[in-house]
Structures are given as C-alpha cells and as structure tokens.
Amino acid sequence: MADSGGTAAVAAPVVKRGSPNTRLLGTELWNAESGVAAKPQLNGAWFASVSDTLYRQYAAKYRQRFGAAPYRLSSLGYDAVLLTVRIGRDWRIGAPFPEARLRDAGGFAGIDGPFRFRDNMAERALEVQEIRGGTTVVVSPAPTGFGR
C-alpha cells in the first residue's frame, strides 16, 4: 500500500475480507510514522525501511546536545553535509565541482545505511520490517553495500 500506515490501517480490513491470507506490504513512509506498529489491522504487514541502527546513535547524541529528539528525516540533511565534505575535501576552490564523484557505483555510507545515485535517482539499501504484536521486527536486514 503506497500510502501512510494510517491509510493502510483503514484499508486493511477491506483487503483482508476479500483475501484473508494476503500479506500487506507498505513503503518506507511507515517507518517515519509514529504509532504505525500499534495498529492491530497492520499486524503481519511488511514494509521496506532504512535501518535504524546508526540513526538511533545519531538521535541519542542529538538529544544529549539539544535536549529534544531530531526530526526523523534530519538524517538526510546530515548525510548530505557529510557527502559534500567527503567529495569536496580534494576539490580545489575555483575548479569545477567534481560532480561525477556523486555517481560512485559503490555508493556512500550514511546514517540510514548505504546509498548511491543512479540515473539521477537516490538508491538506498533497505531492510524489510514486519509489524508484529505492537512492535516492528527486522525480517530481512539491509545489505551493507552495493556489491562491494
């Protein structure tokens, strides 16, 4: 279901009524939605997600420094700055920006796991999580890289 977990929870009973053994599949949107695991209609559903392992460390340090939890998508900005620093450290000011380095087939390590840019799109190594009994469980871990 390519929508929020809230919308999927509303639609789930209709889907299950027509086909009780259907496994619901969700998108990464569900990972950013607090309380999605508490929706009993979604029990057993799978959804793609970035790994939260490094994000939890980042969030703990952020909370310690600023006294509040970071917005979940702040990891994208964090990774963007780190990527710019990585590519820019060998860049001579005044020379053209080495944008070809953004297309490194091996990708880059980020807070949300490996990512790379292909065909002008961001590609991420995602894990699969299952909503199970009010929590989420990783059923297939994210790859640690792109073929390295």
Where is each model-derived feature located?
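Short, low-complexity, Pro/Ser/Thr/Gly-rich segments in the mature regions of secreted, periplasmic
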Residues: 134-148
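Extracellular/periplasmic periplasmic-binding protein-like sensory domains
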Residues: 5-78, 91-92, 142
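Segments of small-molecule ligand-sensing domains
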Residues: 66-81, 85-138
